[in-house]
Amino acid sequence: MKFTPAKPPLTGETLESLTARLRERGEPAFRASQILDWVYKKRARSWDGMTNLPKPLRTWLDDTFDLMPATLVLNKQSADVTDKLLLELRDGSLIETVIIRAPQEGVGQDHSRKTICISTQVGCAMGCVFCASGLAGLKRDLSAGEIVAQLLQVCYREDALTPRAHMELASFDNIVVMGMGEPLANYDALIRALTILNADWGLGFGARRITVSTSGLVPKILQLADEPLGFRLAISLHGATDEVREKIMPVNKAFPLAKLLPAVKAFSEKHGRMITLEFILIDGVNDSLEQAEKLRDIALDLHAHVNLIPYNTVEGLAWKRPSITRQERFADVLRARRVSVTLRREKGHDIDAACGQLRLKTEKERQVLAAAKT
């Protein structure tokens, strides 16, 4: 499921591929570095802004490439300073990118830790019953250029807040590939995008600060382990037994815990880095003390960090988050055995921040407006 645009996005080109295209038209190799410097370091918003390029070359670039394949159509900020960016692609598809700010321990309310969460697909085919992203199914994969464009749009937004100087992407602490879609189901585009994100000629963001999340595609986890850049891994677990996990995550039928956990352990041992286990707490589904004990045992075996996430309500779904008391009781089971655990507090609960929810809400509003015009 791919979209073929009239012009490919420049944000999907590597230094090598762009150099090859330029050489085909007789341009010197250094032009590729100049162009990418304009895109990622100087953040030119138009071809005419690339003033050290000859005009014929700028005309060719305009005819050949799409400089920015994503347009910001909505920016919602929550009371806890979580920003959700809704982006429109060339075919009208909508995707979400989230900026999460949180205070560091010991520095009060200075929101100094910043994370960007990016999407890899329009919709999702995994069918997790609690998730807004997959309610309308999978529409298509994102191209590498569309994935990278999300980071540039974040840069544009941050630049606008500090107009005296360009914001460095390195000022963000982490980039997590945990937005709409299953990242490892769009593997080739993902790796190309992360290569561009990491490269010195690209956005220059360290691989150790990039986390790829998956619902559990075992063959792709093992493939990711062989990637030379060494990205971090997070597993969307959400159930500590097959019985619970299969009820809410269909992927568990193909890759049950007996297959998933050894693959995760192999990844961890190869890279020597702590894995993160993502666990959305859903009232009456996976928030029992028995689930907490099973999760504790899994985390201890994998030497993993556990990220507990109270469920963000999704319109049209009956699931809800447990009480704060129940959340703390669950976390205490892990803490008692010194499992590294984070219990996430409000992060965008007031701005449709459940993954994919803002997109669905906007699409419904567009459909209503379109129907009203007919």
Curated annotation (Swiss-Prot):
It comes from the Bacteria. S-adenosyl-L-methionine binds at G181, E182, S213, S236, L237, H238, N312. Keywords: 4Fe-4S, Cytoplasm, Disulfide bond, Iron, Iron-sulfur, Metal-binding, Methyltransferase, rRNA processing, S-adenosyl-L-methionine, Transferase, tRNA processing. One of its GO terms (molecular function) is 4 iron, 4 sulfur cluster binding. Binds 1 [4Fe-4S] cluster. The cluster is coordinated with 3 cysteines and an exchangeable S-adenosyl-L-methionine. It is found in: Cytoplasm. Its main location: cytoplasm. InterPro entries: Aldolase_TIM (IPR013785), Methyltransferase_A (IPR040072), RlmN_N (IPR048641), RNA_MTrfase_RlmN (IPR027492), rRNA_lsu_MTrfase_RlmN/Cfr (IPR004383), rSAM (IPR007197). GO terms for cellular component: cytoplasm. Disulfide bonds join C117-C355. CDD domains: Radical_SAM. [4Fe-4S] cluster binds at C124, C128, C131. PANTHER family: 23S RRNA METHYLTRANSFERASE, RADICAL SAM CORE DOMAIN-CONTAINING PROTEIN. Reaction proceeds by a ping-pong mechanism involving intermediate methylation of a conserved cysteine residue. This is Probable dual-specificity RNA methyltransferase RlmN 3. The lineage of its organism: Bacteria, Pseudomonadati, Verrucomicrobiota, Opitutia, Opitutales. The gene is rlmN3.
